[in-house]
Structure formats: C-alpha cells, structure tokens
C-alpha cells in the first residue's frame, strides 16, 4: 500500500510462467503509470544487445578455401553450412575460447551431436542439423572456434584486424553472442485498491537454451542497476589515475661495472677504488681516475669510449646517489 502521494509504488507481484525450458513469461506489477514502458524497453534492449554468451566465430573445413564454394557429397553449400553453425548453442565453462572438431562420413545428417569436445563444453541442442552427406564415400571434417563475447559482432568488424595473419581457408562467421533469441513486452492495466491507472509489465522471451529465461532477466536487471549507480551520487566518481612512477635513476646506472666488459686491468683498477656500479663511475672525473694506481691514459680512453657507446660520460652529477637499494647492500 502506498504511504503518501509522493511515494512510488514498488512491484509486489512477480509471476513467472515457464512455458518451456527456453521460453518463459515474466509478469511484474503494480508499476506507476509509464514505468511499464520505461522498464520494459530498457530490459528488452539489454537482453537483445548486451547479454554475454558464446558463439561460433571461425570455421575451417578440410578442402574448402572460401565460403563461396561447395563440397562434393554435401547437400548444402558452404554458406548454408556457416549459417547453420551460427545457430549452434554452446555453453563453455571457465574459458574465453575453445576449438571444437567435427568428423563425419557416410550418408545422413551431420548434427551438433557429432562434434567432439571436452568436459568444459556443453552442446545444448545436440539435434541441431549442420549439413547432410549424400554419398557413402562422402565425408566432412571441420574445426570450429567458439568464443565468449557480448551482443553482435559481424565478421566484417574482424576482417581488417586479422587479415594479415588469417590463413587461407579460415572462414569468419558473424557472431551473435546473445543467448536471447526473441523478446517482447506488453504493458497492461493494473489496479491497486482505488487506483486503476497503474501498469502491469509482461515480458515474454525465448533463449537458445544456454541460459534460463529467469536468469537472463535477472542478469539484465543487474546490468541496468549497475549502469544507473552513477546517477545515485552525481559527485565525480571517476577512478583516480594511477601515475606510473618513473625510476629515480636510469636503470643502466644501477648495473655493475662488470657489465661494461672492460679489460681486466681497467676493471681491477676500478674495483680497487670501490667503484662497483656504473653510477659510481660516471660521477668520477678524468683527473680523479688518472690518480687511480695502475690506470693510465689508455685505460681512461677505453672507459670513456665504453660509456659514450651507452650515452654516458664522466663527470656526471647524480642527485641522491646512491639509491636506497644500493646503499643497503
């Protein structure tokens, strides 16, 4: 019962009529006038375009190079086979993509039940016909890629991005990921006590069997609620940008002097002066290095050339050297 004239009614009756395992009617009432169409249209659009699911995206058929061809001993042409594969209802657990195989020979229909798959894959409608073999010696072998996605993605959207690496004979298929095949809603009159201007929303939908209709409605409502959360609190809810911290020093400065691959004489002279890292070395001047016992002009020239090849030089000034990671060693 409504508490005040400004308080909105909330639906108090939900009736779910399960016509079949893939077909159901969901009734929601009472709704304020106009809310039947508001909610019905929003849920319908989400159910048709935004529900996640699995679909066939690529097919390879032995002996077939392109979709505008036929295969000997097969009643259907390749385009019709691809169209039949689009209707394959597959449920995949724990993976974003799987590759299924199909091998069949001899006269008769080729159905989804002939597909070989592992335990993570369930073929919901094994009786679904893919093609017909018309000769005893006829056979067909194919590899079918099934991917997880959302909504509808035409093959043309993937052609340009995959053209360079797509081998000849790999056929792209328009992917309809949504498990909802048909949905319609109707708004009828509802009554609560003396109010007769209320709405009753009736949603009728059919799925491909990979999801229960009731669960589909629940997921669509969850998606809608999550999208509307930002409007509940209109303050800036953007996530703070995580700034990538730049290293205090060039990583090459933290490497040991041994990485410069100096001659044994030059390397030993530097170690005797406690110059262990490249960062230690570049802060020394030519005059300072020439004062090092046994380090002459030839060794100095070698050191300068090696540093120059790495974009470094002697006499550099490094603030806050050494870093904590080196100082603690």
Curated annotation (Swiss-Prot):
<dbReference type="GO" id="GO:0006351">
    <property type="term" value="P:DNA-templated transcription"/>
</dbReference>
<comment type="function">
    <text>DNA-dependent RNA polymerase catalyzes the transcription of DNA into RNA using the four ribonucleoside triphosphates as substrates.</text>
</comment>
<dbReference type="InterPro" id="IPR011263">
    <property type="entry name" value="DNA-dir_RNA_pol_RpoA/D/Rpb3"/>
</dbReference>
<dbReference type="InterPro" id="IPR011773">
    <property type="entry name" value="DNA-dir_RpoA"/>
</dbReference>
<dbReference type="InterPro" id="IPR011262">
    <property type="entry name" value="DNA-dir_RNA_pol_insert"/>
</dbReference>
<dbReference type="InterPro" id="IPR036603">
    <property type="entry name" value="RBP11-like"/>
</dbReference>
<dbReference type="Pfam" id="PF01000">
    <property type="entry name" value="RNA_pol_A_bac"/>
</dbReference>
<feature type="region of interest" description="Alpha C-terminal domain (alpha-CTD)">
    <location>
        <begin position="249"/>
        <end position="329"/>
    </location>
</feature>
<protein>
    <recommendedName>
        <fullName>DNA-directed RNA polymerase subunit alpha</fullName>
        <ecNumber>2.7.7.6</ecNumber>
    </recommendedName>
</protein>
<comment type="subunit">
    <text>Homodimer. The RNAP catalytic core consists of 2 alpha, 1 beta, 1 beta' and 1 omega subunit. When a sigma factor is associated with the core the holoenzyme is formed, which can initiate transcription.</text>
</comment>
<keyword id="KW-0808">Transferase</keyword>
<dbReference type="GO" id="GO:0005737">
    <property type="term" value="C:cytoplasm"/>
</dbReference>
<comment type="similarity">
    <text>Belongs to the RNA polymerase alpha chain family.</text>
</comment>
<keyword id="KW-0548">Nucleotidyltransferase</keyword>
<keyword id="KW-0804">Transcription</keyword>
<feature type="region of interest" description="Alpha N-terminal domain (alpha-NTD)">
    <location>
        <begin position="1"/>
        <end position="235"/>
    </location>
</feature>
<dbReference type="Pfam" id="PF01193">
    <property type="entry name" value="RNA_pol_L"/>
</dbReference>
<dbReference type="GO" id="GO:0000428">
    <property type="term" value="C:DNA-directed RNA polymerase complex"/>
</dbReference>
<dbReference type="InterPro" id="IPR011260">
    <property type="entry name" value="RNAP_asu_C"/>
</dbReference>
<dbReference type="Pfam" id="PF03118">
    <property type="entry name" value="RNA_pol_A_CTD"/>
</dbReference>
<dbReference type="GO" id="GO:0003677">
    <property type="term" value="F:DNA binding"/>
</dbReference>
<keyword id="KW-0240">DNA-directed RNA polymerase</keyword>
<dbReference type="InterPro" id="IPR036643">
    <property type="entry name" value="RNApol_insert_sf"/>
</dbReference>
<dbReference type="GO" id="GO:0003899">
    <property type="term" value="F:DNA-directed RNA polymerase activity"/>
</dbReference>
<dbReference type="GO" id="GO:0046983">
    <property type="term" value="F:protein dimerization activity"/>
</dbReference>
């Amino acid at each position: 019962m409504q508490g005040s004239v400004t308080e909105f009614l909330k639906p108090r009756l939900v009736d779910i009529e399960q016509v079949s395992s893939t077909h159901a009617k969901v009734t929601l009432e009472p709704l304020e006038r106009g809310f039947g169409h508001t909610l019905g249209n929003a849920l319908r659009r989400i159910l048709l375009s935004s529900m996640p699911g699995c679909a066939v995206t690529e097919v390879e058929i032995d002996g077939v190079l392109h979709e505008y061809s036929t295969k000997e001993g097969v009643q259907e042409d390749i385009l019709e086979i691809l169209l039949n594969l689009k209707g394959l209802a597959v449920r995949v657990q724990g993976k974003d993509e799987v590759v299924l195989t199909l091998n069949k020979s001899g006269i008769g229909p080729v159905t989804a039940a002939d597909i070989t798959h592992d335990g993570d894959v369930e073929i919901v409608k094994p009786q679904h016909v893919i093609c017909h073999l018309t000769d005893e010696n006829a056979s067909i072998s194919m590899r079918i890629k099934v991917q997880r996605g959302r909504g509808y993605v035409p093959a043309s959207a993937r052609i340009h991005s995959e053209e360079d690496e797509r081998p000849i004979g790999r056929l792209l298929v328009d992917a309809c990921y949504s498990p909802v095949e048909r949905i319609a809603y109707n708004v009828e009159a509802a009554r609560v006590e003396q109010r007769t201007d209320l709405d009753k929303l009736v949603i009728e939908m059919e799925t491909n069997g990979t999801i229960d209709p009731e669960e589909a409605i629940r997921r669509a409502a969850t998606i809608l609620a999550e999208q509307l959360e930002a409007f509940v609190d209109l303050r800036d809810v953007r996530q703070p940008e995580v700034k990538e911290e730049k290293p205090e020093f060039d990583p090459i400065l933290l490497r040991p002097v041994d990485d410069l691959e100096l001659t044994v004489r030059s390397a030993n002279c530097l170690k005797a002066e406690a110059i262990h890292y490249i960062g230690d070395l570049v802060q020394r001047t030519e005059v300072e290095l020439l004062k090092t016992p046994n380090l002459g002009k030839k060794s100095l020239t070698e050191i300068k050339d090696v540093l120059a090849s790495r974009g470094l030089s002697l006499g550099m000034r490094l603030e806050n050297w050494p870093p904590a990671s080196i100082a603690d060693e």
